[in-house]
Amino acid sequence: MIYIYKEELLIYFKNHLTLSIDTSKNNFKLYQNKITVNHKTYYFKHISKITLKEYLNEDYDTDTYRERTLWANWKNDKF
């Protein structure tokens, strides 16, 4: 049986920094032009892409993941 045992929110900034957030320990909300993580605001004009990485576990010996794009700045070609 496959199940998700951990989710990680990844925020890729235009200055090539990446913020990794464990969703089980942090609250986040997506808005039209910003994202808030534990009451700290990040505006999309500074972000290239936001993805959700879901770690899947079929059995206790193998770990795989899938990464889904939640938001992307399509005007910016730097992914």
Label the predicted regions:
Residues 54-79:
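Mixed-charge, low-complexity intrinsically disordered segments
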Residues 7-11, 33-35, 70-72, 79:
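Short polybasic amphipathic segments
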Residues 41-58:
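Phosphoinositide-dependent membrane-docking surfaces
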Residues 1-31, 59-64:
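Anionic N-terminal interaction surfaces
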Residues 30-42:
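Short aromatic-glycine motifs in intrinsically disordered, low-complexity regions
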Residues 34-36, 47, 66:
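Alpha-helical protein-protein interaction elements
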